[in-house]
């Protein structure tokens, strides 16, 4: 395993190692990609955890009940594999597929100012949650916000009116009292 990572700013978290599988050094992985198997399309990963960074190569992977089971090059022992539990799986941003003009990766939405139809600033998108019905944006107050409330807004066409990545703004149809 090589220890020369990509620049941290250029990396996107696409999964997380959460446990070991068997005695041959396989690890259990939760994939943030959709579908989850898309994570296996990236043969080289940068692993990060508490200041530690490792470069690894994917040998094989398969689906399981709670995610993926993955074999990494040079990882042949259960005890060694256990040391990777908790590591984030990252890939360079440049490897992500291009999206349609009206589609966005979650990382692109994080940090956008959220302004409603009445020009009221709610705050900034902190992160998104995956729910059964639709994704939900967690909007936390920032300097100049209408109030100090954290808001949960659905990421739907009915709520999100416009996104301007260059301006760093998302316009929404949402009442300030909700």
UniProtKB/Swiss-Prot annotation:
InterPro entries the record matches: PRC_barrel-like_sf, PRC_RimM, RimM, RimM_N, RimM_N_sf, Transl_B-barrel_sf
Gene Ontology molecular functions: ribosome binding
Comment on protein domains: The PRC barrel domain binds ribosomal protein uS19.
SUPFAM superfamilies the UniProt entry points to: PRC-barrel domain, Translation proteins
Places the protein is found: Cytoplasm
Pfam families per UniProt: PRC_RimM, RimM
Role: An accessory protein needed during the final step in the assembly of 30S ribosomal subunit, possibly for assembly of the head region. Essential for efficient processing of 16S rRNA. May be needed both before and after RbfA during the maturation of 16S rRNA. It has affinity for free ribosomal 30S subunits but not for 70S ribosomes.
PANTHER family noted in UniProt: RIBOSOME MATURATION FACTOR RIMM
Keywords of the record: Chaperone, Cytoplasm, Ribosome biogenesis, rRNA processing
Protein name: Ribosome maturation factor RimM
Domain of life: Bacteria
Gene Ontology, cellular component aspect: cytoplasm; ribosome
Major location (coarse): cytoplasm
Record bears the keyword Cytoplasm: yes
BP GO annotations: ribosomal small subunit biogenesis; rRNA processing
Assembly and binders: Binds ribosomal protein uS19.
Keyword Phosphoprotein belongs to the record: no
Residue intervals of the PRC barrel domain: 100-178
Family to which this protein belongs: Belongs to the RimM family.
């Amino acid at each position: 395993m090589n220890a020369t990572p990509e620049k941290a700013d250029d990396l996107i978290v696409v999964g997380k190692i959460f446990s070991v599988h068997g005695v041959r050094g396989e690890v259990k992985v939760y994939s943030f990609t959709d579908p989850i198997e898309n994570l296996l399309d990236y043969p080289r990963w940068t692993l990060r955890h508490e200041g530690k960074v490792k470069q690894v190569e994917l040998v094989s992977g398969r689906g399981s009940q709670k995610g993926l089971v993955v074999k990494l090059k040079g990882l042949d022992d259960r005890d060694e594999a256990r040391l990777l539990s908790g590591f984030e799986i990252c890939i360079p941003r440049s490897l992500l597929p291009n999206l349609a003009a009206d589609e966005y990766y979650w990382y692109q939405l994080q940090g956008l100012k959220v302004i409603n139809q009445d020009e009221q600033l709610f705050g900034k998108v902190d992160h998104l949650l995956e729910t059964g019905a639709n994704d939900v944006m967690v909007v936390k107050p920032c300097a100049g916000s209408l109030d100090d409330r954290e808001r949960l807004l659905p990421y739907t066409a009915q709520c999100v009116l416009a996104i301007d990545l260059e301006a760093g703004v998302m316009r929404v149809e949402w009442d300030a009292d909700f």
